[in-house]
Protein backbone atom coordinates (compact mmCIF):
# COMPACT_ATOMS: atom_id res chain seq x y z
CA UNK A 1 0.00 0.00 0.00
CA UNK A 2 2.88 2.34 0.71
CA UNK A 3 4.28 1.79 -2.76
CA UNK A 4 0.88 2.56 -4.25
CA UNK A 5 0.59 5.84 -2.32
CA UNK A 6 4.12 6.84 -3.35
CA UNK A 7 3.25 5.96 -6.96
CA UNK A 8 0.13 8.15 -6.75
CA UNK A 9 2.21 10.98 -5.30
CA UNK A 10 4.72 10.75 -8.15
CA UNK A 11 1.91 10.68 -10.71
CA UNK A 12 0.38 13.76 -9.05
CA UNK A 13 3.70 15.59 -9.34
CA UNK A 14 4.00 14.51 -12.98
CA UNK A 15 0.48 15.78 -13.64
CA UNK A 16 1.43 19.12 -12.10
CA UNK A 17 4.57 19.21 -14.24
CA UNK A 18 2.46 18.45 -17.31
CA UNK A 19 0.23 21.42 -16.50
CA UNK A 20 3.17 23.73 -15.79
CA UNK A 21 5.16 22.83 -18.90
CA UNK A 22 2.31 22.38 -21.35
CA UNK A 23 3.31 23.25 -24.90
CA UNK A 24 -0.29 23.35 -26.12
CA UNK A 25 -3.69 23.65 -24.44
CA UNK A 26 -4.52 20.10 -25.47
CA UNK A 27 -1.69 18.70 -23.38
CA UNK A 28 -2.38 21.04 -20.48
CA UNK A 29 -5.89 19.65 -20.16
CA UNK A 30 -4.51 16.10 -20.19
CA UNK A 31 -2.18 17.08 -17.34
CA UNK A 32 -5.08 18.57 -15.38
CA UNK A 33 -7.16 15.42 -15.80
CA UNK A 34 -4.20 13.25 -14.75
CA UNK A 35 -3.55 15.36 -11.65
CA UNK A 36 -7.22 15.39 -10.63
CA UNK A 37 -7.71 11.64 -11.12
CA UNK A 38 -4.54 10.81 -9.20
CA UNK A 39 -5.41 13.28 -6.42
CA UNK A 40 -8.83 11.69 -6.01
CA UNK A 41 -7.20 8.25 -6.02
CA UNK A 42 -4.85 9.46 -3.31
CA UNK A 43 -7.80 10.56 -1.18
CA UNK A 44 -9.47 7.23 -1.87
CA UNK A 45 -6.39 5.36 -0.64
CA UNK A 46 -6.53 7.39 2.58
CA UNK A 47 -10.11 6.25 3.18
CA UNK A 48 -12.00 9.42 2.28
CA UNK A 49 -14.20 7.82 -0.36
CA UNK A 50 -17.17 10.22 -0.47
CA UNK A 51 -15.11 13.39 -0.69
CA UNK A 52 -12.96 11.74 -3.34
CA UNK A 53 -16.03 10.87 -5.41
CA UNK A 54 -17.49 14.39 -5.08
CA UNK A 55 -14.19 16.02 -6.03
CA UNK A 56 -13.78 13.64 -8.97
CA UNK A 57 -17.22 14.53 -10.32
CA UNK A 58 -16.62 18.27 -9.87
CA UNK A 59 -13.16 18.07 -11.44
CA UNK A 60 -14.50 15.98 -14.32
CA UNK A 61 -17.14 18.63 -15.07
CA UNK A 62 -14.59 21.41 -14.72
CA UNK A 63 -12.10 19.64 -16.98
CA UNK A 64 -14.81 19.24 -19.61
CA UNK A 65 -15.42 23.00 -19.60
CA UNK A 66 -11.68 23.75 -19.65
CA UNK A 67 -11.11 21.29 -22.49
CA UNK A 68 -13.90 22.76 -24.64
CA UNK A 69 -12.70 26.29 -23.93
CA UNK A 70 -9.05 25.56 -24.70
CA UNK A 71 -9.74 23.52 -27.84
CA UNK A 72 -12.10 26.14 -29.24
CA UNK A 73 -9.60 28.97 -28.80
CA UNK A 74 -6.43 27.08 -29.78
CA UNK A 75 -5.38 28.04 -33.29
CA UNK A 76 -2.11 26.09 -33.52
CA UNK A 77 -1.90 24.19 -36.81
CA UNK A 78 1.23 22.38 -35.59
CA UNK A 79 1.22 22.34 -31.77
CA UNK A 80 4.39 21.44 -29.91
CA UNK A 81 4.45 18.08 -28.18
CA UNK A 82 5.96 17.00 -24.87
CA UNK A 83 8.92 15.48 -26.71
CA UNK A 84 10.20 18.78 -28.16
CA UNK A 85 13.49 19.98 -26.72
CA UNK A 86 12.17 23.26 -25.37
CA UNK A 87 9.39 21.55 -23.46
CA UNK A 88 11.72 18.82 -22.15
CA UNK A 89 14.15 21.46 -20.88
CA UNK A 90 11.34 23.40 -19.24
CA UNK A 91 10.05 20.24 -17.53
CA UNK A 92 13.57 19.25 -16.44
CA UNK A 93 14.04 22.64 -14.80
CA UNK A 94 10.81 22.10 -12.85
CA UNK A 95 12.05 18.67 -11.73
CA UNK A 96 15.32 20.22 -10.51
CA UNK A 97 13.40 22.88 -8.57
CA UNK A 98 11.21 20.19 -6.97
CA UNK A 99 14.23 18.08 -6.02
CA UNK A 100 16.02 21.05 -4.46
CA UNK A 101 12.85 21.95 -2.58
CA UNK A 102 12.53 18.36 -1.36
CA UNK A 103 16.12 18.31 -0.13
CA UNK A 104 15.73 21.64 1.66
CA UNK A 105 12.38 20.52 3.13
CA UNK A 106 13.98 17.29 4.35
CA UNK A 107 16.74 19.20 6.14
CA UNK A 108 14.34 21.67 7.72
CA UNK A 109 12.07 18.87 8.94
CA UNK A 110 8.93 19.62 6.98
CA UNK A 111 7.97 15.96 6.64
CA UNK A 112 6.56 15.51 10.16
CA UNK A 113 2.83 15.21 9.56
CA UNK A 114 0.27 12.48 9.72
CA UNK A 115 -3.22 11.77 8.45
CA UNK A 116 -5.74 9.79 10.45
CA UNK A 117 -9.09 9.08 8.80
CA UNK A 118 -10.73 6.36 10.90
CA UNK A 119 -11.58 6.80 14.58
CA UNK A 120 -12.12 3.53 16.38
CA UNK A 121 -13.19 3.27 19.99
CA UNK A 122 -13.72 -0.28 21.17
CA UNK A 123 -16.30 -1.97 18.99
CA UNK A 124 -17.42 1.23 17.24
CA UNK A 125 -15.73 2.59 14.16
CA UNK A 126 -16.95 5.94 12.85
CA UNK A 127 -15.38 7.20 9.65
CA UNK A 128 -14.63 10.90 9.49
CA UNK A 129 -15.78 10.84 5.90
CA UNK A 130 -19.42 10.37 6.83
CA UNK A 131 -19.41 13.30 9.23
CA UNK A 132 -18.24 15.35 6.25
CA UNK A 133 -21.33 14.22 4.32
CA UNK A 134 -23.56 15.67 7.02
CA UNK A 135 -21.59 18.92 6.98
CA UNK A 136 -21.94 19.14 3.18
CA UNK A 137 -25.72 19.12 3.38
CA UNK A 138 -26.34 21.01 6.63
CA UNK A 139 -23.87 23.84 7.14
CA UNK A 140 -22.57 23.95 3.58
CA UNK A 141 -25.83 24.83 1.80
CA UNK A 142 -24.87 28.47 1.29
CA UNK A 143 -21.47 27.52 -0.05
CA UNK A 144 -23.10 25.05 -2.45
CA UNK A 145 -25.36 27.80 -3.75
CA UNK A 146 -22.44 30.20 -4.21
CA UNK A 147 -20.36 27.52 -5.95
CA UNK A 148 -23.27 26.56 -8.21
CA UNK A 149 -23.88 30.19 -9.14
CA UNK A 150 -20.18 30.61 -9.90
CA UNK A 151 -20.18 27.53 -12.13
CA UNK A 152 -23.25 28.75 -14.04
CA UNK A 153 -21.65 32.17 -14.47
CA UNK A 154 -18.44 30.53 -15.70
CA UNK A 155 -20.43 28.44 -18.17
CA UNK A 156 -22.09 31.55 -19.61
CA UNK A 157 -18.76 33.38 -19.83
CA UNK A 158 -17.15 30.48 -21.69
CA UNK A 159 -20.11 30.17 -24.05
CA UNK A 160 -19.98 33.90 -24.76
CA UNK A 161 -16.24 33.81 -25.43
CA UNK A 162 -16.53 30.83 -27.73
CA UNK A 163 -19.54 32.25 -29.57
CA UNK A 164 -17.50 34.28 -32.04
CA UNK A 165 -19.20 36.83 -34.27
CA UNK A 166 -22.87 36.01 -33.61
CA UNK A 167 -22.56 32.59 -35.22
CA UNK A 168 -23.24 30.46 -32.17
CA UNK A 169 -20.87 28.02 -30.52
CA UNK A 170 -19.91 26.31 -33.81
CA UNK A 171 -17.69 28.42 -36.02
CA UNK A 172 -15.54 27.85 -39.06
CA UNK A 173 -11.82 27.73 -38.43
UniProtKB/Swiss-Prot annotation:
<keyword id="KW-0472">Membrane</keyword>
<protein>
    <recommendedName>
        <fullName>NADH-ubiquinone oxidoreductase chain 6</fullName>
        <ecNumber>7.1.1.2</ecNumber>
    </recommendedName>
</protein>
<keyword id="KW-0812">Transmembrane</keyword>
<comment type="function">
    <text>Core subunit of the mitochondrial membrane respiratory chain NADH dehydrogenase (Complex I) that is believed to belong to the minimal assembly required for catalysis. Complex I functions in the transfer of electrons from NADH to the respiratory chain. The immediate electron acceptor for the enzyme is believed to be ubiquinone.</text>
</comment>
<dbReference type="GO" id="GO:0031966">
    <property type="term" value="C:mitochondrial membrane"/>
</dbReference>
<keyword id="KW-1133">Transmembrane helix</keyword>
<dbReference type="Pfam" id="PF00499">
    <property type="entry name" value="Oxidored_q3"/>
</dbReference>
<feature type="transmembrane region" description="Helical">
    <location>
        <begin position="1"/>
        <end position="21"/>
    </location>
</feature>
<feature type="transmembrane region" description="Helical">
    <location>
        <begin position="87"/>
        <end position="107"/>
    </location>
</feature>
<dbReference type="InterPro" id="IPR001457">
    <property type="entry name" value="NADH_UbQ/plastoQ_OxRdtase_su6"/>
</dbReference>
<feature type="transmembrane region" description="Helical">
    <location>
        <begin position="48"/>
        <end position="68"/>
    </location>
</feature>
<keyword id="KW-0520">NAD</keyword>
<keyword id="KW-0249">Electron transport</keyword>
<dbReference type="InterPro" id="IPR042106">
    <property type="entry name" value="Nuo/plastoQ_OxRdtase_6_NuoJ"/>
</dbReference>
<keyword id="KW-0679">Respiratory chain</keyword>
<keyword id="KW-0830">Ubiquinone</keyword>
<dbReference type="InterPro" id="IPR050269">
    <property type="entry name" value="ComplexI_Subunit6"/>
</dbReference>
<comment type="similarity">
    <text>Belongs to the complex I subunit 6 family.</text>
</comment>
<keyword id="KW-0496">Mitochondrion</keyword>
<keyword id="KW-0813">Transport</keyword>
<keyword id="KW-1278">Translocase</keyword>
<feature type="transmembrane region" description="Helical">
    <location>
        <begin position="27"/>
        <end position="47"/>
    </location>
</feature>
<feature type="transmembrane region" description="Helical">
    <location>
        <begin position="139"/>
        <end position="159"/>
    </location>
</feature>
<dbReference type="GO" id="GO:0008137">
    <property type="term" value="F:NADH dehydrogenase (ubiquinone) activity"/>
</dbReference>
Amino acid sequence: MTYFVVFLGLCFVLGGLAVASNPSPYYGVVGLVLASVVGCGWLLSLGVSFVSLVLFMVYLGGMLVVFVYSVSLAADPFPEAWGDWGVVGYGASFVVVLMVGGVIGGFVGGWDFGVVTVDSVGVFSARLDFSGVAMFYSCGVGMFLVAGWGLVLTLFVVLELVRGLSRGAIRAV
